[in-house]
From Swiss-Prot:
<keyword id="KW-0009">Actin-binding</keyword>
<feature type="compositionally biased region" description="Low complexity">
    <location>
        <begin position="1364"/>
        <end position="1379"/>
    </location>
</feature>
<dbReference type="GO" id="GO:0003779">
    <property type="term" value="F:actin binding"/>
</dbReference>
<feature type="compositionally biased region" description="Polar residues">
    <location>
        <begin position="1177"/>
        <end position="1188"/>
    </location>
</feature>
<feature type="compositionally biased region" description="Pro residues">
    <location>
        <begin position="1380"/>
        <end position="1394"/>
    </location>
</feature>
<feature type="domain" description="EH 2">
    <location>
        <begin position="465"/>
        <end position="554"/>
    </location>
</feature>
<feature type="compositionally biased region" description="Basic and acidic residues">
    <location>
        <begin position="1144"/>
        <end position="1156"/>
    </location>
</feature>
<feature type="compositionally biased region" description="Polar residues">
    <location>
        <begin position="134"/>
        <end position="144"/>
    </location>
</feature>
<feature type="compositionally biased region" description="Polar residues">
    <location>
        <begin position="111"/>
        <end position="127"/>
    </location>
</feature>
<dbReference type="GO" id="GO:0005509">
    <property type="term" value="F:calcium ion binding"/>
</dbReference>
<feature type="coiled-coil region">
    <location>
        <begin position="1054"/>
        <end position="1172"/>
    </location>
</feature>
<feature type="compositionally biased region" description="Polar residues">
    <location>
        <begin position="323"/>
        <end position="338"/>
    </location>
</feature>
<feature type="compositionally biased region" description="Polar residues">
    <location>
        <begin position="1472"/>
        <end position="1485"/>
    </location>
</feature>
<feature type="region of interest" description="Disordered">
    <location>
        <begin position="895"/>
        <end position="1485"/>
    </location>
</feature>
<keyword id="KW-0254">Endocytosis</keyword>
<feature type="region of interest" description="Disordered">
    <location>
        <begin position="268"/>
        <end position="309"/>
    </location>
</feature>
<feature type="region of interest" description="Disordered">
    <location>
        <begin position="1"/>
        <end position="161"/>
    </location>
</feature>
Length: 1485
C-alpha cells in the first residue's frame, strides 16, 4: 500500500533480496536442476488441513468438491524441464471442497512445460453432492503404497483448557464449581452442546420460559453451544432467578465484554489435533522457503515452524501461483482440466471465509499461453508468454461455482462462533480493532491474552489493515484534528497489553520527527508494529522501507530534491562566478527543475515559484521620475500608465481634463456634503435616543427613590458588611469555648450525679460494701480502707448488741452495690453521650449557619467586574463629561428625594406626640425620659430608625440595671464607624423633626388666623346671642343720643358714621375674641407641658426613691453579711477550740477504748453486756448528728424584702428583681452569676458606717438531701471551709430511737458525723466510734440555752462551701414555706437596736435558694414597728427528710427570753437521766 510498486501488498512479485525475479523461479522438485528425477511411488506428504476430523457443514452456497488433476490413475508425466528427465507426476483424485477448517497452503501451479499432458478424464465443473470428507492423515496415507508403516495414532488431547481468568460477576468458589461441572460434562471438548446444557439447566427447576431467556442471554456466539464463560453466565443467571431477582433484558456491558473476551481467548487458543507428518520420502515442498535463510531479515517473510490455526489464517493471501510456494488454502488440486482440447484456465482460489471483493480473485494455475492477471489486479510488469504444451485455446473459466462464495465462519460450530470469528485472512485483527475502539467500559475487564498469536504477517500493510487502522484513527480523532496526541496514543496503545519498552520503541519508529503526535499514516504504522509484536515478531530497530508512510517518504524526497538542487546551484554559481555578478531579474537557476515538473508541466501557463518576480509596472498609480535608475536602463516615463508625455497634450485636452477634474471634485464635494448630512442626522438621532434614555433613567430613578422600600437600598453597604463579618467571626470564635464549657459542665454533672447516687445508695443500704470510702490514688479502695470498713462493721454490730438492737443484717452482698453503681453509671453515661450528641449537633448547625452567612457575604461581595462597573456608572469614573454630569444630577436628585421622604415619614402630628407622652405605659418605660430613641421608633419611622431605637432602649435598660447594681457598664471605648454614623444621623433627624414640628405649629396658627379673618363679616350674627357680649362703647351711645337729638339736622352723616363705627367695633370685638382664644390655647398648652413635666418629674422621683431604697437595702444586706462573717469567724474559732478539747478527750479515751476492746474480745459470756447495753449506751442523746437535728424553714424568710415594695413601674420592678436576684439565687448558680459578686462589691463601696443591727439570723430552708445526708458532707468535708450559722434557740433533741426518726442507724450516724477529723488513718474511725459510744453519755444533758455552742457537725444547718453545689429548693417546699407568715416589712433606714431585724439567711460563700414569687397584695413599706409576730408551726417537711425541727429564733439567751415573752410555747422535754450508769463502763472479769 505504501510502496509505489506492486510489491508492497504481499504480491508474488515482491522484489525482495534473496528471491529470484519474476519468470526466473527455481524448479520445484525434490532434486536439484540437472539431475534426473526417478519415478516416485509415493504421493504428496500429509499436509495439515485444519480440522479435518470435523464433520462437514456445507450449504448450497459453498463450493462443491471437484476432481482436479489426473483423476483415476497415477501415470508418470514429464514436466518438460530442459535438461531433466521426465518427472513422474502423481496426482491422486482429491476432494477439493471447502471445509469449515483452515486449509494448509498448497502448490497448485506448475512451471512452464514443453510436453503435453494427456488428460483422461475431464473434471466435473458442476456442484454434485459431496462425499464424506477425508482428513489430512487420510490424504497423507493415500500416497503410501501399502508397504509403509501405518501412521501413528493421533495424540491424546489434554482436555478442555479453561483460561485462568477471573470472572467478576461470580465468586471464585462459584467459578471453581462451574469449571469442575463444565469439565465433567464436556470432557475433552471446549464447548458444551445444547442437550447437555439443557440437562444441567433443568436441574434448577426453573420454568421453561425462564430457561429460554437464560439460554438466549448466555449463548453470545449464537452457535448452539456454550463455552465455559457462557456456561458460567448461564449458571449465574439461573442463580439470579432462583434467588428471586429478575433477569435483565440484556446483558450489562461489563459482563458481555468479559464473556466475549474469554470466548475469544478460548477460540484463538485451540491447538491442532492432527499428528506430526510421518517420516517418509515424500519431497519437502518447504525446501524453497528454506533456501532464503541467508537473506537479510528485514524484508524476508519469516515462516513459523509449526503451523497452527492462527498461522494458517494469516497465510491466506492471494498469490500468483506457479512460481514461489503459494498459499491458496486448497488441497493440491489441478483444476480447469476440461478436456484435451481445453487448456488450463484460471480458477478462483483463496479462502472461502472472505468476501469476493477482498481475496477471491482469479489465479493462474498450471499452463497458460497468455499472461493472466491473478491474485493481485494492480499494475505489474508485463509477463512474457509461457509455452505450456497446450494450444492457444485456453480460456479463462471459474470452476466450483465461485459466484456462490459468501463469507462463512470457519472451524467447528461454537469454536469461534458467528460473532467472535474474524472475517479477514489476518487473525485477531478484528479482535484487536474491537479492543482498541473507544467504547464504554473498556477500562474494566478487557484482557489482551486473545490478541497474541504466531501468524505470518508481512511487512507491508494491507488494504484491509489500513482500513481498520484508519477507522480506529477516525474513531479516536473525534474533533477531526488530523492527529492523535500522546495521551490518547498512550491510552490506545496501552490496551494492546505490550510492555512499556516495546511501546516506547514502537512510538519512536512511528514518530520519526519527534512531534509528539501521530497522523493517520503514522498511526497505521504504530498499529501494524503492535499487531506484529502481538503475533511474535520483534520490533525492528529501524523502520523498514515498506512501512515508511507515503507522506513522509514523498516529503523526504522533496526535501532531498530541494537540498540537492540548492547544493548543485551553489556549486554551479561558485564554479561559474555568477554569485559575484549582480542579480538579474528574470533569471532562474531552476528552470529545468521546477516543482511542477518543468516547463512542460500542465501548469506551464502559471508562473512557477522559482520564476516569480513582482511586476511593479502592473501597479497603477503615480511613480516618481526621480526614482532610482537600475543599471543602464533608460529613464522610465513618470506616469506609469501614461504612454505620452504632458507636452504632447493640447490646450483643449488640458481644459477638458481640467473640467473633468472639476466635475470630479464637485462630485466628491457633493458626496462629502451628503455624507456630512447623513452623519448629522445620525448624530441627531443618537442624541434623541440618548436623551430619551436619560429621561427614562430619571423616571426609573424617581420611581426607585419614591418606592416605600427605597430606604433599604443603602443598608447593604461595605462598612456594615465588614462589621457584621467581624461580629460573626467573634461569635464563631466563641463557639469552641462555649462548647468546651458545656462539655466540662456535663462532665461535672455526671460526676455529681454519680456521687449523689453513691450517697443515696449508702443511705438506702448502710451495710453495703459501697460504704467503703477509698483513700488511695484517684479514690481507689485500698486494703487499709477494707480493714477500716470491717472494723467499723464490727463496731456497729457490737454497738447494736450492746444497745439491745438487732444486729444489722448484711444482706446486701458485695456485688450488688457494684451492680447498682454500674447501672447508674450506664444511665449517666448514656445521658452524657446524648447531651454530647446534642452539643455536637448544635456545633455542626452553628458551623453550617456560619458557612451560609459567610457564603452570603461572599455572594454579595463585589467582584472586580462589578466594582469596575459600579465605579464607572455610580461614581462616574472613566465616562464622558455629559454622562458624568448626568450621573451627578441623578445622585443629587436621589439624595434630595431621600431627605424629602424621610422628612415626610418623620412628620408626625403634635397631638399624637402628646398622647404618646401621656400614655402611662410609655411613662413607665425603663427610660428615664422620652428621648430621641423613643420618638424615632414611631410607626412612621424607617426600619433602620426602629432598629436603632430598640437597640438604644435595650442598651439604656442594661446600663440602668447595671448602674443600680453598682456596676460600671461595659462600653466599647472605640466607637465604630457605623455606630457613629447612626448616632449622627439620629441627632440630625431629631433636630429636623423638632424644627418641622415648630414650623407646622406656626403654619397651623397662621392658617387658623387667616381663616378666622376671612369668616369675619358673617360671624357677628351667630356669635352675639351665644358669646359674652362686651358692653357697648361710650362713643356709640353718645352717637346714638346725638343722632336722636339731631335727627333732622344730619341724618345722613350720622347714619354713615354709625355704620362705620359699628363695623369698627365688630372688628375690634372679633380681634379681642381671637386674642382671648389664642391666650386660652397657649395657657392650655403651657398647662399640658407643665403637667407632662410634672409627671415626668414624679416618675423620675419615684425611680430615684426606688433606687435609693434599693441602695439602702443593699447597704443593710452588706452590713448583715459583714456581721455574719464576723460571727462565723468567731464561732469558727470557738469551734476550733472545742474541737481541740474534744480531740484531747478522744486521745484520753483511746487508751480506755483499747483496754475495753481487749476485755470485750476476751469475754466468753456476753449476756452481761447485753443486760447493761440499753442502760449505758446512749449515743443518740450525747452525739446528735445531722440526721437528728434538722433546720426548720423560717416563716420570716419566705418572702425577701425587695418584693415587699409596691410595684411603681415595670422598670422599678425589674430593677428590684435584678437586685434581689443575687440574694435569691441558689448556690449552684452563684458561681455563674457575675452580678452577685459585683453587687456585693458595689454595695460595699456605697455603704457608710451603718447603725448596729441585732445579731439575729434566720436559717434559710434547705432541701432534704442537703440537710439529712451526712455522706454528702463527709465527701466534701476536706474542701469545706468552716462557717457559722446560728442554730435555732428553740431546737429540741429527740429522745426516741433513731429508727423512728429517719431510719438511720445510730452507729452509722455517729460514724458519719465524727469521722471527718482523722479518717485518714485506717484505724482512726474505730477509736472515735468507740469513744463516742462509751463516753457519749458521761456528761449531763446540756441545757437548751447552750445549744448554740455545738460543733459544726452538730449544727442544724450543714456548713457548705461554694465548691459544693446544693440543689435548688423545689417549688413545693417554696410554696409551703411562703405563706407561713405575712411578709415582714423592709427594715427602715435607721433600724432600732431593740427591734430584731428579720432578713433571710445569706451566706457569703453560698447563695440561698431562689425566693418564691412575690405575693399579689403586698403592703407598702410602713414605718418601723414592733417585731413581727411568730408564725404558725412550720409545714411538714418533704418526703425523705427527717422530722422537722422547731423554727429558728434568736441566737442567744436574750432572744430566747424575748420569744418566750411574746408567747412562744415550748415543747415539753423529758430528760432521761442516766448519770448513774454513764460515768464509766463496767470492767468484766
Amino acid at each position: 500500500m505504501y510502496s509505489s510498486s506492486n510489491s508492497f501488498m504481499g504480491g508474488a512479485n515482491s522484489a525482495r533480496p534473496g528471491q529470484p525475479p519474476f519468470m526466473q523461479q527455481p524448479s520445484y522438485s525434490q532434486y536439484p536442476p540437472g539431475q534426473p528425477q526417478s519415478q516416485q511411488q509415493t504421493g504428496f506428504p500429509s499436509q495439515p488441513t485444519g480440522y479435518g476430523l470435523q464433520p462437514p457443514q456445507l450449504v448450497g452456497s459453498q463450493l462443491q468438491p471437484q476432481q482436479t488433476g489426473f483423476p483415476g490413475q497415477l501415470q508418470p508425466q514429464f514436466t518438460g524441464f530442459p535438461g531433466a528427465a521426465p518427472q513422474q507426476q502423481q496426482q491422486q483424485q482429491q476432494l477439493g471442497g471447502f471445509q469449515q477448517s483452515v486449509q494448509q497452503p498448497q502448490f497448485t501451479g506448475y512451471p512452464p512445460q514443453n510436453q503435453l499432458l494427456s488428460l483422461q478424464a475431464p473434471s466435473t465443473t458442476g456442484l454434485p453432492t459431496r462425499p464424506a470428507p477425508r482428513t489430512s492423515s487420510e490424504v497423507a496415507s493415500s500416497f503410501n503404497d501399502g508397504a509403509g508403516v501405518a501412521p501413528p495414532p493421533p495424540p491424546k488431547s489434554a482436555g478442555s483448557k479453561i483460561p485462568s481468568i477471573r470472572l467478576s460477576f461470580i465468586t471464585a468458589q462459584d467459578q471453581a464449581k462451574f469449571e469442575q461441572l463444565f469439565k465433567s460434562a464436556v470432557g475433552d471438548s471446549q464447548t458444551i452442546d445444547g442437550g447437555k446444557a439443557k440437562e444441567l439447566l433443568l436441574r434448577s427447576r426453573l420454568p421453561g420460559s425462564e430457561l429460554s431467556k437464560i439460554w438466549i442471554l448466555s449463548d453470545t456466539t449464537k452457535s448452539g453451544q456454550l463455552f465455559f464463560p457462557e456456561f458460567a453466565l448461564a449458571m449465574y443467571l439461573c442463580n439470579l432467578r432462583i434467588t428471586g431477582r429478575e433477569l435483565p433484558p440484556s446483558l450489562p456491558e461489563k459482563i458481555k465484554n468479559e464473556v466475549s473476551s474469554m470466548v475469544d481467548i478460548i477460540s484463538f487458543g485451540v491447538p491442532d489435533t492432527q499428528p506430526e507428518p510421518s517420516r517418509s520420502n515424500v519431497p519437502s515442498f518447504d525446501a524453497p522457503l528454506l533456501e532464503n535463510k541467508s537473506a537479510p531479515p528485514a524484508p524476508q517473510q519469516p515462516q513459523p515452524q509449526q503451523p497452527t490455526n492462527a498461522h494458517l489464517l494469516s497465510q491466506l493471501a492471494a498469490q500468483p501461483t506457479g512460481f514461489l510456494p503459494q498459499q491458496t488454502g486448497f488441497q493440491p488440486n489441478q483444476s480447469s482440466f476440461l478436456g484435451p482440447s481445453a487448456g488450463l484456465a484460471p480458477q478462483a482460489t483463496g479462502f472461502p471465509g472472505q468476501s469476493q471483493q477482498q481475496y477471491l480473485q482469479t489465479q493462474p494455475t498450471g499452463l497458460m499461453t497468455n499472461p493472466q492477471a491473478t491474485g493481485y489486479s494492480g499494475p505489474r510488469p508485463p509477463l512474457p508468454p509461457m509455452p505450456t504444451g497446450f494450444g492457444s485455446n485456453l480460456s479463462p473459466a471459474q470452476t466450483g461455482g465461485a459466484s456462490a462464495l459468501v463469507a462463512q465462519p470457519t472451524g467447528i460450530p461454537g469454536q469461534w462462533g458467528f460473532v467472535n470469528a474474524p472475517s479477514s485472512g489476518l487473525p485477531n485483527i478484528e479482535a484487536l480493532k474491537q479492543q482498541l475502539m473507544p467504547q464504554p467500559g473498556r477500562e474494566g475487564g478487557f484482557t489482551t491474552a486473545g490478541l497474541s498469536g504466531n501468524a505470518s504477517i508481512p511487512w507491508a500493510i494491507t488494504k484491509e489493515e489500513k482500513k481498520i487502522y484508519d477507522d480506529l484513527f477516525r474513531a479516536w480523532d473525534g474533533f477531526h484534528k488530523g492527529f492523535i496526541g500522546g495521551d490518547t496514543a498512550i491510552e490506545i496503545m496501552g490496551q494492546s497489553g505490550l510492555n512499556r519498552q516495546d511501546l516506547e520503541r514502537i512510538w519512536t519508529l512511528a514518530d520519526p520527527h519527534n512531534r509528539g503526535r501521530l497522523n493517520m499514516d503514522e498511526f497505521a504504522v504504530a498499529m501494524h508494529l503492535i499487531y506484529r509484536k502481538l503475533n511474535g515478531y520483534p520490533v525492528p530497530s529501524r523502520l523498514p522501507p515498506e512501512l515508511i508512510p507515503p507522506s513522509t517518504r514523498n516529503l523526504n524526497d522533496s526535501i532531498g530534491t530541494v537540498k540537492s538542487l540548492l547544493s548543485q546551484d551553489a556549486e554551479s554559481r561558485k564554479a561559474s562566478g555568477a554569485f559575484l555578478q549582480p542579480q538579474k531579474t528574470g533569471v532562474s537557476y531552476l528552470k529545468e527543475h521546477s516543482f511542477r515538473g518543468g516547463a512542460r508541466s500542465p501548469g506551464v501557463g502559471r508562473k512557477d515559484a522559482t520564476l516569480f518576480k513582482n511586476n511593479d509596472e502592473a501597479a497603477a498609480g503615480y511613480r516618481s521620475s526621480a526614482r532610482r535608475r537600475v543599471g543602464n536602463n533608460a529613464r522610465a516615463a513618470s506616469p506609469a500608465t501614461s504612454h505620452t508625455s504632458e507636452e504632447e497634450l493640447s490646450v483643449e485636452q488640458l481644459k477638458k481634463k481640467i473640467r473633468e477634474t472639476q466635475i470630479m471634485l464637485d462630485a466628491v464635494d457633493f458626496q462629502d456634503e451628503n455624507r456630512a448630512e447623513e452623519d448629522e442626522a445620525l448624530d441627531r438621532r443618537d442624541r434623541r435616543e440618548a436623551e430619551s434614555l436619560m429621561d427614562r433613567v430619571r423616571r426609573i430613578q424617581d420611581d426607585i427613590d419614591t418606592h416605600p422600600n427605597a430606604t433599604f437600598r443603602n443598608l447593604d453597604n461595605g462598612a456594615e458588611k465588614r462589621s457584621l463579618r467581624r461580629q460573626l467571626q467573634a461569635y464563631e470564635d466563641q463557639v469552641p469555648q462555649v462548647a468546651s464549657e458545656v462539655r466540662r459542665i456535663e462532665r461535672e454533672l455526671a460526676e455529681a450525679k454519680l456521687e449523689l447516687f453513691r450517697l443515696k445508695d449508702a443511705k438506702a443500704h448502710p451495710n453495703s460494701a459501697s460504704n467503703i470510702v477509698g483513700t488511695g490514688p484517684g479514690g481507689a479502695v485500698t486494703e487499709a480502707d477494707r480493714i477500716k470498713a470491717r472494723a467499723r462493721a464490727r463496731m456497729q454490730a457490737r454497738a447494736a448488741e450492746l444497745a439491745g438492737r438487732p444486729v444489722p443484717a448484711s444482706a446486701d452482698d458485695d456485688g450488688a452495690a457494684a451492680r447498682r453503681l454500674e447501672s447508674e453509671s450506664t444511665v449517666i453515661r448514656a445521658d452524657r453521650e446524648r447531651n454530647e450528641a446534642m452539643t455536637r449537633d448544635v456545633e455542626e448547625s452553628v458551623r453550617e449557619f456560619t458557612r451560609s452567612l459567610e457564603d452570603s457575604f461572599k455572594e454579595g461581595g463585589e467582584t472586580s467586574t462589578r466594582e469596575h462597573e459600579r465605579r464607572r456608572w455610580e461614581d462616574a469614573l472613566g465616562v464622558e463629561d455629559v454622562i458624568r454630569d448626568f450621573i451627578y444630577d441623578l445622585k443629587r436628585g436621589s439624595r434630595t428625594a431621600h431627605v424629602r421622604k424621610e422628612e415626610e415619614t418623620r412628620t408626625l402630628p403634635t397631638h399624637d406626640h402628646r398622647v404618646r407622652h401621656e400614655d402611662p405605659s410609655i411613662a413607665s418605660r425603663p427610660s428615664p425620659a422620652p428621648s430621641a430613641g423613643s420618638v424615632g421608633s414611631a410607626p412612621g419611622a424607617t426600619h433602620e430608625d426602629r432598629v436603632a431605637a430598640a437597640r438604644e432602649r435595650a442598651q439604656r435598660r442594661i446600663a440602668e440595671r447595671m448602674a443600680a447594681a453598682g456596676l460600671k457598664p461595659h462600653t466599647d471605648s472605640t466607637e465604630t464607624l457605623v455606630q457613629r454614623q447612626e448616632r449622627e444621623k439620629r441627632e440630625r433627624e431629631e433636630r429636623l423633626r423638632r424644627a418641622e414640628e415648630e414650623d407646622a405649629k406656626r403654619e397651623q396658627e397662621r392658617q387658623r388666623r387667616l381663616a378666622e379673618e376671612q369668616r369675619g363679616p358673617a360671624k357677628p350674627a351667630a356669635t352675639k346671642p351665644v358669646g359674652k357680649k362686651p358692653p357697648p362703647a361710650p362713643p356709640s351711645r353718645r352717637g346714638r343720643t346725638d343722632s336722636a337729638g339731631q335727627a333732622d339736622a344730619r341724618p345722613a352723616v350720622e347714619e354713615t358714621a354709625a355704620t362705620e363705627q359699628a363695623a369698627r367695633e365688630q372688628a375690634i370685638r372679633e380681634e379681642q375674641q381671637a386674642q382671648e382664644e389664642e391666650t386660652k390655647r397657649l395657657e392650655m398648652e403651657a398647662q399640658q407641658r407643665e403637667q407632662e413635666l410634672l409627671k415626668e418629674k414624679e416618675a423620675q422621683e419615684a425611680r430615684l426613691r426606688a433606687l435609693e431604697e434599693q441602695v439602702r437595702q443593699g447597704k443593710v444586706r452588706k452590713q448583715e453579711e459583714k456581721r455574719r462573717k464576723e460571727e462565723a469567724e468567731r464561732s469558727a474559732k470557738e469551734q476550733e477550740a472545742k474541737l481541740a478539747a474534744q480531740r484531747a478527750e478522744l486521745e484520753m479515751a483511746r487508751e480506755r477504748e483499747r483496754q475495753l476492746q481487749l476485755e470485750l474480745e476476751g469475754l466468753e459470756d456476753e449476756s452481761s453486756s447485753d443486760e447493761e447495753g440499753p442502760v449505758n449506751i446512749t449515743p443518740q442523746d450525747s452525739t446528735p448528728t445531722q440526721s437528728q437535728v434538722l433546720p426548720a424553714p423560717s416563716p420570716a424568710a419566705a418572702a425577701p424584702e425587695p418584693e415587699l415594695e409596691p410595684p411603681v413601674s415595670p422598670e422599678i420592678t425589674s430593677s428590684a428583681s435584678s437586685h434581689a436576684a443575687p440574694s435569691s439565687f441558689s448556690p449552684e448558680t452563684e458561681s455563674k452569676n457575675p452580678y452577685f459578686r459585683i453587687t456585693s462589691q458595689a454595695a460595699e463601696n456605697q455603704v457608710s458606717s451603718p447603725p448596729p443591727v441585732p445579731q439575729t439570723t434566720i436559717t434559710s430552708p434547705k432541701t432534704d438531701v442537703q440537710s439529712t445526708n451526712p455522706f454528702h458532707r463527709l465527701a466534701q468535708q476536706e474542701a469545706a471551709k468552716p462557717a457559722f450559722t446560728a442554730p435555732g434557740p428553740l431546737e429540741r433533741k429527740s429522745r426516741v430511737r433513731p429508727e423512728a426518726d429517719d431510719d438511720w442507724s445510730a452507729a452509722g450516724s455517729d460514724f458519719d458525723s465524727s469521722d471527718d477529723e482523722d479518717d485518714e488513718r485506717p484505724g482512726g474511725g474505730s477509736a472515735k466510734q468507740l469513744a463516742s459510744i462509751l463516753f457519749g453519755t458521761m456528761a449531763p444533758p446540756r441545757p437548751l440555752s447552750a445549744m448554740d455552742d455545738k460543733s459544726p457537725s452538730k449544727s442544724s444547718t450543714p456548713v457548705q462551701d461554694n465548691t459544693v453545689a446544693s440543689p435548688v429548693v423545689p417549688e413545693a417546699s417554696a410554696s409551703l414555706s411562703a405563706p407561713a407568715a405575712p411578709p415582714p416589712p423592709p427594715p427602715p433606714p435607721p433600724p432600732p437596736a431593740s427591734a430584731p431585724m428579720v432578713v433571710p439567711s445569706y451566706d457569703p460563700s453560698t447563695a440561698p435558694p431562689p425566693p418564691p414569687p412575690a405575693p399579689p397584695i403586698a403592703p407598702p413599706a410602713p414605718p418601723p414597728g414592733p417585731p413581727p409576730p411568730p408564725g404558725p408551726p412550720p409545714p411538714p417537711a418533704p418526703p425523705g427528710a427527717a422530722a422537722p425541727a422547731a423554727p429558728a429564733g434568736a441566737a442567744d439567751r436574750s432572744a430566747l427570753l424575748a420569744s418566750i415573752q411574746m408567747g412562744k410555747g415550748l415543747r415539753k422535754v423529758q430528760t432521761n437521766d442516766r448519770s448513774s450508769s454513764s460515768s464509766a463502763g463496767r470492767v468484766l472479769g
